[in-house]
């Protein structure tokens, strides 16, 4: 990101693209985006714009912070474990307590209830102050591989 006061969606988008490249997947292979959702206007807007540019409006996007709070340094690991569980259960959790999404999120598919996770792949974002960006692609294990 450009700065803490003015995050830029381009590095966020590139981070997700690089994760997809490493996984040898395309955006259309991803069935769910687990957003970092910092809860800051600037951070959430940059992440929402980057997700919309890369995945469009059809891929479900939610955050788990409404379920467990922002656990600071542990948030990435805890949310990653929850994403593994969602893949195994083939169900994705909506963002809890999201009553009025910001206008900047209007181009995203924000599920309001638990949905089936049709795809065998998801991407999980984790971002920190100063431009420390991390996106991880998870794929469901199959015995074919």
Where are these regions (language model features)?
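Conserved "HGTGT" condensation-loop signature of ketosynthase/thiolase-family condensing enzymes
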Residues: 1-145
């Amino acid at each position: 990101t450009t700065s803490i006061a003015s995050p830029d969606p381009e590095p966020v988008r590139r981070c997700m693209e690089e994760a997809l490249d490493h996984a040898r997947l395309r955006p259309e292979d991803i069935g769910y985006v687990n957003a970092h959702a910092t809860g800051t206007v600037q951070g959430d807007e940059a992440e929402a714009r980057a997700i919309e540019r890369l995945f469009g409006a059809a891929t479900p996007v939610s955050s788990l912070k409404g379920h467990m709070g922002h656990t600071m340094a542990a948030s990435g690991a805890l949310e990653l474990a929850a994403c593994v569980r969602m893949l195994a259960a083939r169900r994705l959790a909506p963002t809890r307590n999201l009553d009025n999404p910001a206008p900047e999120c209007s181009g995203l598919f924000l599920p309001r209830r638990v949905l089936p996770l049709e795809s065998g792949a998801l991407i999980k974002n984790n971002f920190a102050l100063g431009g420390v960006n991390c996106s991880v692609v998870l794929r469901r294990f199959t015995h074919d591989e």
